[in-house]
């Protein structure tokens, strides 16, 4: 019974929030989220709003991503530094993969500036994908080129502002990057609808090694 649930946060159509559509011109529109409950479940408007593919000025635009986080405390320092503390409003997951079946790297390296995450709490707390992405790019360039990191090379091709790629990022963004483990957590919790991800006990757990969640019900 939804009425028995405790509401954590409510939203109106004109507020930027999880699930909103993000467009090629850097704008966004309502994706239908109206309430988040304390158990991590959500209430979506019915009918769910459709993308608005034409601006009021009748200019065409494309959906290139979906907002998965707007909580400032879950947005990394590097992301905030890139655009300025007050200019970061949310994080967006791309609609399409840059590539499929592509290798992360041709080499194995433990970089000092990129944290190894083992426990659930470490995974949850690692929220700056842009930091990790930038440090790995710096390392790749220092050893002669990004070709040794195919996944990163694919992302950088998307970030090429002079390419004809339809998913290149708007100029008022950080550009695309590979999410950190904590950002993947937020994607699974906020867009994937996995109840365990919203559990404070899981977010602060010291469990590490190989583990998996079972019996989480249907994912929307």
What function would you assign to each model-found segment?
Residues 2-172:
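Short, compositionally biased
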Residues 144-177, 181-220:
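An exposed tryptophan-centered "aromatic clamp" motif
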């Amino acid at each position: 019974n939804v009425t028995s649930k405790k509401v954590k946060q409510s939203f109106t159509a004109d507020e930027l929030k999880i699930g909103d559509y993000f467009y090629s011109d850097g704008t966004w529109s309502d994706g239908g989220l109206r309430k988040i409950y304390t158990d991590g479940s959500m209430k979506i408007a019915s009918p769910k709003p459709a993308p608005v593919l034409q601006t009021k000025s009748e200019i065409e635009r494309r959906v290139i991503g979906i907002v998965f986080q707007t909580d400032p405390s879950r947005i990394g320092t590097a992301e905030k530094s890139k655009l300025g503390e007050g200019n970061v409003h949310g994080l967006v997951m791309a609609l399409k993969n840059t590539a499929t079946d592509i290798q992360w790297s041709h080499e194995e390296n433990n970089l000092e500036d990129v944290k190894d995450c083992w426990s659930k709490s470490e995974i949850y707390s690692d929220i700056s994908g842009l930091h990790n992405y930038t440090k790995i790019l710096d390392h790749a360039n220092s050893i002669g080129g990004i070709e040794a990191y195919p996944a990163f090379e694919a992302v950088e091709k998307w970030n090429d502002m002079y390419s004809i790629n339809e998913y290149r990022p708007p100029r008022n963004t950080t550009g695309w990057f590979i999410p950190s483990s904590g950002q993947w957590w937020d994607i699974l919790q906020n867009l994937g609808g996995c109840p365990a991800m919203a559990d404070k006990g899981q977010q602060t757990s010291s469990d590490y090694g190989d583990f998996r969640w079972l019996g989480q019900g249907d994912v929307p």
